[in-house]
């Protein structure tokens, strides 16, 4: 997806897949606890099923946490961050991205304000899919989004 967009923009000096690998979550990382139990337990459960996929998910969240640190450094005291996230399902386990976002910013001196939950407007994906490619075995896709609001102390 990212590569095709770059071709259209004339920025296609990388091989297909190279850009995706360089973006957030594009590489693999050893699965290690963050110290945030809701995410740690889900990652451990995914790791028991598919260590390669767990490694990719771990890398995404490590880089996501790093991006939150970068944003936190730019926000002034009493400033707010508002992140719209979805809690996707991997290997049958829902990732608590909304809670992880709040926790990540709390580690950077923010206080949690609230989370607004709403249906995803104009959803273009089916409400269920079959990630295992086994007939009849379907799981729900994301149908809610979370607007997580925090304030810098």
Where are these regions (language model features)?
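Class I S-adenosyl-L-methionine-dependent methyltransferase catalytic core
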Residues: 1-83, 87-153
